[in-house]
Amino acid sequence: MTQGYDTFLAATANDRRDAFVAAGRRLGAAEQNIEKDFWVCWTLDALFNGLPAGGPRLLFKGGTSLSKAFGLISRFSEDIDITVFRDDLGQGAHAADLEALSGKKRRARLDAIRAACQAYIAGTLTGQLIEI
C-alpha cells in the first residue's frame, strides 16, 4: 500500500480533520466530501496494492474509474464499482454460453457465480482487508 495513507492515518483525529477542512476550502468542496474521497482512494489502494498476490483479479469500473484512474471527469464519488473475475473464482463462463442455456439452467449458473463471488467477498477478501 501507499505509505502516505499510513502516515495520514497515524495523525491525530484533529490533524486529519484540519487537513480535510483545508483541502475542502482549497477545492471549494465540503470537508465531508473530501473525507469520503480520501476513503474511496484508500479503499482502491487497499484493493489494488494491499492484497496478497495470486488472489482473484479485480476490475475497477464505472464513473469513479473515469475520475480516479483516468482523470476524465472531475467529481467526488459516492461509491466504487469493482468486479471480481469469475474465472478466478472457478466459475468461468462466456456470455454466449450463458445465453445458450435455458432460463432455469442460466439462473442456476448465475446463482452459482453470485454465490462464489459473495463467498469470496464475505470471507477471504474481508479477512484480507481487515488485516490491512
Show where each model-derived region lies.
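Compositionally biased terminal segments of proteins
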Residues: M1-I132
